[in-house]
Amino acid sequence: MSYKKVFLKPGKEESLKRFHPWVFSGAIARVEGEPEEGEVVDVYTSKKEFIACGHFQIGSIAVRVLSFRQEPIDHAFWVRRLQVAKDLRCALGVLGNPQNNTYRLVHGEGDNLPGLIIDVYDHTAVMQAHSAGMHLDRMVVAEALEEVMGDVIQHIYYKSETTLPFKADLLATENGFLKGGSPENVAMENGLKFHVDWLKGQKTGFFVDQRENRALLERYAKGRNVLNMFCYTGGFSFYAMRGGANLVHSVDSSAKAIDLTNENVSLNFPGDTRHQAFAEDAFKFLDRMGDQYDLIILDPPAFAKHRDALRNALRGYTKLNAKAFEKRRPGGILFTFSCSQVVNKQDFRNAVFTAAAQSGRSVRILHQLTQPGDHPVNIYHPEGEYLKGLVLYVE
């Protein structure tokens, strides 16, 4: 199949030779054929040598690379890529595990499918497009997904209203089922059940990327008073309860998130009085709280989504962690995270270091955390390592 062509400026092919999956607009010398948003194009060097093919889009990232081979991007291509993604999840033990039917099947660049996210909750796949190309290819992707996953996937929900690039010249799209409909919205993670709000919830309905970190927290919870800030649907809260916490308090500014947290706690621990939830701004809650907590989780939403917001984001992380350090009991544990892609590991550690120094407390790092294996990082795309976390012992 012949695709329209993008030609690079001299020397701008070097990142593609290192298999980085993005072509920036500033690297392009000319475009032949006037490709539309989301159309597949072939990319050539200034010497007219083929180097990659991918989805074309107006914006800073002009091409998201699908292949470094000259091949048709057809049904067979999608089947091959999804099969590789499935094989990895089988190797990780997250697919086919009776104690866990929640996992990420496709993680964008990490699975060589930039712009595509697919999370699985029991028999429902929630598909999210972050590029015009993946949006336009959603039906062929859904067909390939059915072929690869078989009866494992009985429902496919497409949720991209808020993730598609606003500059893309796309017709308005609505969230909705591409296959099936009205499935049960209860899934399981490490033997714990939870409701998934894929219709209106954040991301695909649940923060799948914290599965292993929640399991680690469970090991530290016994006999402790736990505070789960920015709790969303309460994932860390009910792991802490299963781990034997004395009490667990969950805080989120969203009343709907608090309702979901209470539902999930009741689903796993009906009648358990150890848990209490608060619909309140996190900073205000930290200002008024006492020193009764000896295990605190700080897992805020992304403080920065663009590099021009980085400085303010780092100040926000410092302020948030400083408040937690100030009121921590001696011998307390802090789980603190950043999910901002533009905040790298060293930036985040420096922000937490500053907060610790301001508090005057003795602080030691017990664990350095990241995303789980079903959120793989393409070694040629280090930007994909977005989740950073530290487990700290505070004297």
Model-predicted segments: where are they?
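Conserved SAM-binding loop of SAM-dependent methyltransferases across substrates and taxa
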Residues: 233-246
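C-terminal catalytic and target-recognition region of SAM-dependent MTase-like enzymes
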Residues: 333-395
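Non-catalytic accessory regions of SAM-dependent methyltransferases
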Residues: 1-122
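S-adenosyl-L-methionine
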Residues: 256-297
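Conserved class I S-adenosyl-L-methionine
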Residues: 223-232
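Conserved SAM-binding motif I beta-strand of class I
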Residues: 247-252
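Non-catalytic substrate-recognition/targeting regions of SAM-dependent transferases
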Residues: 106-119, 135-207, 385
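Mobile active-site "lid"/loop adjacent to the S-adenosyl-L-methionine
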Residues: 293-323
